[in-house]
Amino acid sequence: MSAELFENWLLKRARAEHSHIVLPEGDDDRILMAAHQLLDQDICDITILGDPVKIKERATELGLHLNTAYLVNPLTDPRLEEFAEQFAELRKSKSVTIDEAREIMKDISYFGTMMVHNGDADGMVSGAANTTAHTIKPSFQIIKTVPEASVVSSIFLMVLRGRLWAFGDCAVNPNPTAEQLGEIAVVSAKTAAQFGIDPRVAILSYSTGNSGGGSDVDRAIDALAEARRLNPELCVDGPLQFDAAVDPGVARKKMPDSDVAGQANVFIFPDLEAGNIGYKTAQRTGHALAVGPILQGLNKPVNDLSRGATVPDIVNTVAITAIQAGGRS
């Protein structure tokens, strides 16, 4: 599958779901341009947060048509008080007062997340102008995780040389435990399946099978056991070096009896450092299309953008979020 075909497939899937996505960063031109494209192609309904007058003026300057977008100013929206009351209740164990909650709800990330929590939007995409922490912290506090997830994690969908792969976790967890890695493997496989991947999961390491030793290898072995405990039907193996995971010739030599080695398509990196380096190496030197990070484990979809995101990146991430939202309804 080429990058172009995959992007077209994403948009077609998202259009079929026709979800409602909130974009909090209405003062960013890239967000407005992406919204224009999404609305023009009837991919999803869009709410943009910010000053409606300024958004309309900037859209006119850029030659954009946002007539069908919902433009919402959190500072004057009548839901602000209701959202503040809900947030104060959600965070009462942290002694958040109603006055503090009112101030917090003026923040675009919190207001957008509360819209998703209340069903006023099906998902949120942010991060073009804000940090990852600013984007996803509200979701931890408001939307929270599904019962079967102890952590929020992420995958990137990677289109490389005609192959569709998933890399996880490349954006959220710095140093996951063996148990968390096993859970991330299971959840990543489930997310990958939403996007047409028949998951064969490789838990990556610097060692393949029992060829090496050390605490990191032991962690990969324990992660494999946890993944199999959580989902006995999952096609997963490890520890695997990357070449053994993807190259059938290497796999025959190093792991000849593995159902995953040589044909893996979901790759679980040992930590955030390795995962982030891995996906960016594939993106920058292998010219892979990287779509994500796609957050997983939350009750409702919220996805983060890189501050270097292009307009096509934003369009793809909104499409991903729309598909995630549709899959839950």
Swiss-Prot record:
It catalyses: acetyl-CoA + phosphate = acetyl phosphate + CoA. One of its GO terms (biological process) is acetyl-CoA biosynthetic process. Keywords: Acyltransferase, Cytoplasm, Transferase. It is found in: Cytoplasm. Its EC number is 2.3.1.8. Induction: Activated by RamA and repressed by RipA and RamB. InterPro entries: P_Ac_Bu_trans (IPR012147), P_AcTrfase (IPR004614), P_AcTrfase_dom1 (IPR042113), P_AcTrfase_dom2 (IPR042112), Phos_Acetyltrans/Butyryltrans (IPR050500), PTA_PTB (IPR002505). It is an enzyme of class 2 (transferase). One of its GO terms (cellular component) is cytoplasm. Pathway: Metabolic intermediate biosynthesis; acetyl-CoA biosynthesis; acetyl-CoA from acetate: step 2/2. One of its GO terms (molecular function) is phosphate acetyltransferase activity. The keyword Magnesium does not apply. Disulfide bonds: none annotated. It comes from the Bacteria. Its main location: cytoplasm. NCBIfam families: PRK05632.1 (NF004167), PRK09653.1 (NF007233), pta (TIGR00651). Belongs to the phosphate acetyltransferase and butyryltransferase family. This is Phosphate acetyltransferase. The gene is pta.
